[in-house]
């Protein structure tokens, strides 16, 4: 980063606004420049302004204690480290601004501002305002104190401390290296190079080690807190689960039988319900079929009306066309009449428009000469008005200027009078305060002595309070020590009692554990598992036998149903063959009979004559049967054919039903065979399971004897025997567990007491140390009190003469400092007022003389301008009087435009009237043509309408239907016939389907009744089944609870296994951290910090030696033991010397080399293009000064610009470019940039 400019106002002694621009000559081309001035002139204030603008702090504010207070002009005290303390006394506002280039290459402006309330000198200090903006567009990036500091640090890459050691090397910051001892040098090195990070790392390593140790101890404590079930308890739980599982299995077969019986009852009841429902459905379908008579009649009428739709539509359309033609003829006649009237009106309007156009044209020509004269006068009047307005404006401006000048003259005269009065008042006030002038002159020292006296009094009171507090703490610590000793004695007695109780429990536990080892419980659990397997094998065999019997019954029933279905299928096929044969036999005769009864045959028979050949077959004989007998024969043949078709359809339905029943029966038979096979397989598996498990059970020592084949009685006896053994073992294990629990609790209580005893001892030791410390504090407090009292008495003695002159006798009197300050302030105010009045009078004299001359000149100019304005107004009025009679005073252009508009409007009206007349003539001709055409169309439509009505009447007569009936049928919604037809078909199909369903349901009911129902009623069966299921549910809950207890124990065991892994991992991690802690860790962080500081000091010495080679080649720095520094004297054979043995000039050069090295190391890789050194060069001789300047100038080749603050004249003479700070009196200073070209 690079500093581009520094600006400010009212920063300490720099009262006037100032700006130092490093981008313009001569500073822009100067690699080295000096900031010069007398001591106290304000050289360092420039650097304060730079730091305030960038970071809101300044080096001089950080030097003192932040708890110190300083008085403010507003009557309050502020911290000595408050940045507002930089604000100049007597100033209402002050600011500092820095323009700099950031790491990104862009330019930014940082600003700091302090102000007082209401911008008054006596106002209360307000909160500091800070801002950061981008220079190129003025965009504000931050406007809050913390945000500005963070943004500046991000843009420059430097924190405030890094800025102070990289860009600004303030007074005393680097010479402290040579003055400090090893401990102080470590602190300074950590401060200026940022190696405090390593101290933090060392502390973190120590804390992490302690955390790992605590985590390891916590895991060990967690492992000791868990309690597990022993093997006997787990075996007992397993036995109870097996017993309840066996009982559940035994009840399963009975539940299956009861469920099957209830299912048979439900199937019979369902079959009866379905027969009843099918009968009800058939009755409902037949009733709906009977109700459809009116619908059938309506459908017949709709079918007869269908051919009449077209004639009806044609007649309606003809009537509509006739109505439309008549309406068109009437409208055409009316239009012809209206067109004739419009033609007459348009002819009259055309005549009137022609007359008006002639009249307006003549009037327009008559006004021509008048308009020309009026236009000439209008131009002259406009020119005269402009000239008159300009003259009036000039007169008003000169009058206002003269009045302003006269007011300024009066203001200066009044100011002169006020300044004279102020000078007289100040002189009188100084005369009144002449006796207090010495007090004002000695006030700074007197104020410091008073402050020191107050501080001594406060220190004495604080020391006395501290001594009393130490005595009170000593008494409290003694009482706490006595209480701790009593608690320790109680815990020791309790620990002895617990040790005796633990020994007694151990004696009672030993014989029980010997008689009931954990292996016994495990053996019983294994026997229980084996018996459970035998129980499952026995249950599986029983269930397989039951399933096999059921499958055999199902197979027999399926075979019977299949045989019956095949017989029904054969009979249905025979019926279908007979019906189809009968249909085929009746088809030919019926077709011949229909042909004989047709209209064509009847017409041909009427043309036959005896002896003439038949035109069809050529026969000469023509027997003619009676038509009535022939019709009767055809009707009988048609009825027989319909009956045959019905029989064929019934046979097809029966065939389909028989085939479905046969397929269903065959599927049931296949499923029954598969069920028999699975039952056989399951029975064989059950016998094999019994055979595999029984030898293993018999081989166990505690197991009862069992036969080689499944035997329910023997198995039940074995389970009873096992239950008794497990009950006895569970009781013994419960007693062992209780004793172990009591023993563990006793050990836990003893451990708690041991920790308490350790805590008691630690408390006693801590209290002893605190008592010693408290006694020491009391002695120190008494010593401080004595010292403060002596300092107070000495200051009171020193203050006595000055207080006596001021009429005061007690330096600790309330309000003394305020009274003395008020007197001193009054003297200072009077002196300041006198000086200000004299300065004001000197400045006002030439201003007042010039104001009087300006007033006379302005008055003469105003009078001349007023006369010119009056002349111009007269000329303008004469022209207006000449123009007023013409055109009634109206503007010429407006009057001419109005008459021209009237002429043009008359011409347009004449043209429009002619066009309207032509349009009306054409409209009349078109209306007459339309009237003739519509009359012809109406005649033709009437003829067509009569023909359509005649066709419709003939069609209605042929269909035996009236026009009203046809209209009602046609008005029905579209699709009515189809809906009626579909509804009737659905009713007929519903009756057929209901009859078929009723027959099927009756067949199903008969089959179920043939199988027979259980003897026991459904209510009794349901009650028995509910009791069995409730018992099974209870056993399932008990099994679940017991299983959950086993699962919890297993989970605890698994958790403990994981805890062991965690404990081992924690131990390994603790070992690692202990090794790291041994290397670099420490509670205070010193271990690693010293290592880092030693390395950093080596690098710092290396950088410093490079600069020292240019500044003073005789010496070379080196690090001695730990962090101490020595110099090697090359002129003395590289002899090592202490830094304190260096002369003043040599010491400064070494300090300067260290400062430059620190500036290289302090920026975390950020290059600082500007460097300020605030350190005196007065200790250097001419040669050393030249070397120092040459070394600083070489930094320009590295891209740096170096500024040196110094009041040494030799330094100023050797540096051409300077920022000179000069005192101006009254605590004010000003600055100026000096150099080549300025």
UniProtKB/Swiss-Prot annotation:
Give the region (Disordered) as residue ranges.
661-713
Enumerate composition-biased segments (Low complexity): 661-673
**Signal peptide range in chain numbering:** none
Task: Give UniProt keywords alphabetically.
Answer: ATP-binding, Coiled coil, DNA recombination, DNA replication, Endonuclease, Exonuclease, Hydrolase, Nuclease, Nucleotide-binding
- Biological process (GO) annotations? DNA recombination; DNA replication; double-strand break repair
Gene3D superfamilies (alphabetical): P-loop containing nucleotide triphosphate hydrolases (3.40.50.300)
Q: List, alphabetically, the InterPro entries matched.
A: P-loop_NTPase, Rad50/SbcC_AAA
**Where is ATP annotated to bind?**
37-44
Coiled coil spans? 395-438, 466-487, 521-600, 724-770, 901-943, 1019-1052
Tell whether Nucleotide-binding is among the UniProt keywords. yes
A molecular function (GO) held by this record is: exonuclease activity
Its biological purpose: SbcCD cleaves DNA hairpin structures. These structures can inhibit DNA replication and are intermediates in certain DNA recombination reactions. The complex acts as a 3'->5' double strand exonuclease that can open hairpins. It also has a 5' single-strand endonuclease activity.
- Subunit notes for this chain? Heterodimer of SbcC and SbcD.
Q: Its family?
A: Belongs to the SMC family. SbcC subfamily.
Q: What is this protein called?
A: Nuclease SbcCD subunit C
Please spell out the taxonomic lineage of the organism that makes this protein.
Bacteria, Pseudomonadati, Pseudomonadota, Alphaproteobacteria, Rhodobacterales
Q: Which gene encodes it?
A: sbcC
